[in-house]
Structure formats: structure tokens, C-alpha cells
């Protein structure tokens, strides 16, 4: 029998990484580590064009990284498994949150065999709260593939890495260079920003010509035999110094930076077209029957495939949220329900959507004959359960539904307020 997942609030940080990450200076909304001062950070009148001084630029960057690298747990040994997990976790996730999840993950799945032997339910539960759950399912599929086709040894060849589920060009480059020190340039948003400023890339970085130029420059500035340090240094510099609010006085590349020399740092990178934000009104309901509540397991397709949830869906034009939750329950389960109380609104977002989740307490509409509820007719799920509220913690749920589930057992009772 596998050990049960640790309860919320009992998570461990065995090596104190989270505490180390929190030992920082705070600037505005950003938390930044204390950086080693850089001499000559403000460029002298004689700007040193980066194309003509690549060895100096490389040395300055590596020296800065050696002095300022954050104590991240996957940097202790650079094992392929740990590098891979960290790279997947940090997609769409802030660093401090990623470190916390990484440490918990390693307690539960310390190596490839442990992950490959896990069930999808266990993996999704460990991933809960990070979102984009296809990443977790791909991790499990890739781990099993490595065990079956590579004898349990994570491949070092970039083509073999790229063939694993859920691994794209960036993650391939990151694993190849950071885990195996292969001469492959990593390009993420941080690297794009650094290169766009140092080399004055004057068009949106995601456009074809700019992307090609950045890729070519990233390869050119990669020092021989130092891919691991260099790629991490570029990403670290973009995260800590060359951010949206640049700290040019702390930058080791200031004397090489063309945008700084021209006084246009805040104009680089050139912004692309912003994605439009779409608001969505969604409903869900907690259907109670005596001391148990109804949950269902989503179909395997989609962003939250395979997760447990309270049934619900979008509010259609002309509907009130109360009408929508009654309709959704009828469509998804066959149950006829009525709203007994509002539980509040949970606000959250994903990709370009901003969601308001209206939550309601529900009861079955039946005659007065006491009997168990009829079995549901599921149209949007593969399974369902009637559970005591305390049992909900064992299920993997989307973040908003987890917030609702946790509120049901909170000392103050259900939400009864808007988040």
C-alpha cells in the first residue's frame, strides 16, 4: 500500500530552501535577493558593443552567477530527473511556489521508478494547485516511457528528450544543457528580455525575424563547455535584475548593454500584441444528502481531465446563476435539485480567462419517502461518489474546487463570502 498523501499544513522543507528563498529584500511587489555589488555597472561613456566583446561579456555573466545564484534544490546535484521536474513545474509558476511544490514532490516521488509506479490519481493529487494538469499526466507518461524504453535511465540525447511526452523545444534545451551540460542555448522569456536589451532587438521578440535573431545570438554568446552555468546565469539575470523593472545599477552586463547606452531600456523588449481577457461566469453546487456531498470525476479530456469536482458549468445568456446550477446538475447527473443557500463567489483565472465561480448549497428535489438517492446519469464524468466532507481532502481537485471543498470543513463553515 502506498503511503497516504501528507495533510495540508504538514508539508516539510527538509533543507530549508523555502526559508532561504524568503531571505530577501523586497522592492515593490517583487521579492529580490541581496545581490553582490557589481563594479562598473553603469556604462561608461565608451559603450562596449556586445558583438565585439563576447569573451568579456561571458566572463562577467558567469562571475555574477557564481556570486548570486539562488540556492535552488535541483542545483545540488543536477540530476536529470530533478532538472526535468523543476523545469516542468516552473512553467506558469512563480519560483518560490515552485520550490515548495518541488520539495513535496521529491518526498513523494524521489526518483523515476517511484514516479513511474504511481497512479494517475496520486500524481494529480501531488500536482494539485499548480494548474495545467496535462503537465502532471505527461510527467507520468514520460516516466513510464523512460522505464520501458530507456531502462530507467533518463536520455541525454536531445532528440530522445524531445520525444518524451510533454517536452517541447525549451524544456529539451534546458534538460540537455543543465542536466548534461550539452552545448544547447536555452531561450525563455527572461533570456529574450536580456538579449533584446543587450543587443537592441527592435521588434517584438515573438515575431519571426526577432525570434530568429534572438536564437542566433543565444547560440553565439554560449561559451564552450559552460552551457549549464551560462544558461542558468542568463535566466537568473533576467529574473532577478533585467526584469520588467530593470535594476541596471546591479547588472553585470550594463557596460555591454546597447539599450542602456541608447537610453531605451524600458522600450526593450518591444511589446507584442496583448491577448484579450475574457470574463466567464461559472456555477457549481455542493449537493448534500444527510452527511455526505456529491462529487464526480471529470472525463479524461481537457485541462482538468481526471480531476474530481462539484458538478457545474457556464452561465448561459439570460440565465441567473441559480438557474444555471439547477440546469447543469440536471444535464450532468440527471438529478433534480434546488438551491438552499449561496456559498459565495470564487475568483480565479487561467490563460486569458478571468472566472467568477458562483457556489451554491443544493438539495435533491424528491417526495417525502426516505430512501437513498437514485444513481446519477453521468454525462460529463466517468465516476461519482457520495463522501463525507472530511474525505474530500484525499481527492485531486482543480484549485477553485479545492478552495470550496476546504471551506466546507473550515471552523467558520462554508464560504458565505466572496473571495
Model-derived regions: residue spans:
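The catalytic Nudix box helix
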Residues: 310-344
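Catalytic cores of DNA base-excision repair glycosylases
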Residues: 32, 53-55, 59-60, 64-249, ...
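NUDIX/MutT-family hydrolases
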Residues: 361-412
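Short, contiguous pre-domain boundary segments
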Residues: 24, 28-50, 69-70
